[in-house]
Every structure is written in C-alpha cells, then in structure tokens.
C-alpha cells in the first residue's frame, strides 16, 4: 500500500490535480489499484454542477491514468520519468460519481512495447462500474 506522500514521490501531480488518495495494490509495470475519496469540498464541484454535484467524467479518466502511471513509473527503469496520456479508447461512463463516493480505480497493463503502453481501466463505486476505458500512455523524460 502507498500513502499520498509515497504517491507524490512517483508521479508529479499535485493539488488540485492529484486525484489519487492511496494505492492499495501495485504490481510494478503491470497493474495498480487506487482509491479516490470524493469530497464535497472538491474545487471542481463549484461549477460542475452547483446545484447537483457530479464529478466530471474526464477527471475520473485522469484519476485512472494517475493510477496507471503509478504502476508504470514504479518499475525500476521508469523511475524519475513521466507517463504522458497518449489516448483514450472505448470510454464509457455508467454511473454518476457524487460527493461522499469512494472511487476504486483499477488499471491493468494489456500491452507495453518500448515507451508506449495500453491499459484496461475501470473505476467503480460500491462495486458498480462508473467508468471503463482503454488508456494509452507514453513514457518520457522532462525536456529542459
């Protein structure tokens, strides 16, 4: 299990864009399972929507990508590098995510070739699928 400080050592995201609270499981380079506790105090709820708060779907996908990044960047040869979003395929939103929900974020790498990889990503709330997608990423370095 990784806490928030350990996650911040692996991925560069910070508030308000760090969308993973803890990692429950990680199999380096293969898969990871994380948690996002969705609080009523999330900044995005101010505008999405003021009278009926719903977590934006793109942020659910971003949270999944961050969990996938932890899995990939935990691998020894990728440490200190960045995982860039390279694509989203077959994305479906099946359940609204509201304040008080706990998102379980699971990403399993299905294919990795060189610096490019694909993963199957599923976000659930109370065992119900909220979002599923295939995410593509590219491993790279910071450019000075």
UniProtKB/Swiss-Prot annotation:
Where would you find the membrane-spanning parts of this chain?
Answer: none
Q: Which NCBIfam families does the UniProt record give? A: fabZ, PRK00006.1
Q: Where is the active site?
A: 48
The keyword Lyase appears for this protein: yes
- Report the InterPro entries cross-referenced here: FabA_FabZ (IPR013114), FabZ (IPR010084), HotDog_dom_sf (IPR029069)
Its gene? fabZ
One GO cellular-component annotation of the UniProt record comes to: cytoplasm
Q: Which family does it belong to?
A: Belongs to the thioester dehydratase family. FabZ subfamily.
Which CDD domains does UniProt cross-reference here? FabZ (cd01288)
**Its biological function?**
Involved in unsaturated fatty acids biosynthesis. Catalyzes the dehydration of short chain beta-hydroxyacyl-ACPs and long chain saturated and unsaturated beta-hydroxyacyl-ACPs.
Name one molecular function that GO assigns to this entry.
(3R)-hydroxyacyl-[acyl-carrier-protein] dehydratase activity
EC number, as in UniProt = 4.2.1.59
Record keywords: Cytoplasm, Lipid A biosynthesis, Lipid biosynthesis, Lipid metabolism, Lyase
- Specify the enzyme's EC class, one word: lyase
Q: What is its main location?
A: cytoplasm
**HAMAP family reported for this sequence:** FabZ
Gene Ontology biological process terms from the UniProt entry: fatty acid biosynthetic process; lipid A biosynthetic process
- Tell me the Gene3D superfamilies matching this sequence: Hotdog Thioesterase (3.10.129.10)
Q: Tell me yes or no: is Lyase among this UniProt entry's keywords.
A: yes
Reactions accelerated catalytically: a (3R)-hydroxyacyl-[ACP] = a (2E)-enoyl-[ACP] + H2O
What's the protein here called?
Answer: 3-hydroxyacyl-[acyl-carrier-protein] dehydratase FabZ
Q: Where in the cell is it found?
A: Cytoplasm
- One family name in Pfam for this protein: FabA
Residue spans making up a coiled coil are none
